[in-house]
Regions:
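RecA-like P-loop NTPase motor core
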Residues: 1-84
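C-terminal accessory helical subdomains adjacent to catalytic cores in phosphodiester-
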Residues: 84, 90-254
Length: 254
């Protein structure tokens, strides 16, 4: 008999028959996420779960069925626009995050660029310097848009943390009094502007949400922009598994 669970019945049956640790990630069966995490964590059973919230829900739901198995589930989510407070709270529940904004940004990190430069026959120093300059310049030009998106996400996060009692009815003014929007705005602005001023490449990769970014750097390696990510993932799955795994795992919180 299959126990009650918030997980879909078919998925729960599939997982209960598995003997590996379960890793819930974002994305779909055909997405980059599953390929990347399956290569990085070959001893885990990787389950793409769609969005961030579904990853969180799946980890919690599966771990509530531990009376039936001895296997613990954990999760990895994109950093996106989440606050440090939110990320710390999730980590306590076994849900870790990338130190880059999106999984594709892993292939823009210095370590990955240097490893891949050698394979593609490009000069590692020149390639990394060119990509770093390009990414920082592009982030600077998009800073206002990125700040606006981060501000919206931060305010949504603050609103979702408000607890309302059964007999309480909040007005717009009441809600505004519960969150300090001015402070949130200042913190977001300061962080993004500081990253630009400092040319802090790692910080920018942690803030920059733009899925087209990684598809525009292939030419720096001497290959077509459109095939860079697929080539990089294929090498992660094959000939460069050890080198790239060591480079990329550094960018997953633990």
């Amino acid at each position: 008999m299959v126990p009650d669970s918030d997980l879909p019945k078919e998925l729960l049956i599939e997982l209960l028959g598995n003997r590996k640790e379960v890793l819930f990630v974002e994305g779909t069966e055909g997405s980059y996420d599953k390929r990347i995490y399956s290569a990085l964590f070959p001893n885990c059973y990787v389950v793409p779960s769609g969005g961030c919230e579904q990853v969180i829900n799946n980890v919690k739901a599966y771990n509530r069925t531990q009376s039936l198995h001895a296997i613990k589930a954990w999760g990895i989510i994109d950093r996106d626009f989440k606050t440090e407070e939110k990320l710390s709270a999730l980590k306590e529940n076994g849900i870790f995050h990338l130190k880059v904004a999106e999984v594709e940004n892993l292939f823009l990190t210095e370590e990955a660029v240097r490893v891949l430069s050698q394979r593609f026959g490009a000069d590692a120093d020149r390639t990394y310097s060119s990509i770093k300059t390009y990414v920082i310049d592009r982030f600077s030009k998009q800073a206002k848009k990125q700040i606006s998106e981060a501000l919206v996400a931060s305010v949504k996060g603050a609103l979702s943390g408000i607890t309302i009692s059964d007999n309480e009815q909040l007005t717009a003014d009441g809600i505004a009094s519960l969150i300090d929007i001015a402070s949130i705005e200042k913190n977001v602005n300061d962080r993004y502007q500081q990253a630009v001023e400092d040319h802090d490449y790692n910080e920018i990769l942690g803030l920059f949400n733009d899925k087209s970014l990684v598809t525009s750097v292939g030419h720096y390696f001497g290959i077509d922009n459109k095939i860079y990510v697929d080539r990089a993932i294929s090498l992660l799955e094959g000939d460069l598994r050890d080198e790239l795994s060591e480079a990329l795992r550094h960018y997953i919180s633990h």
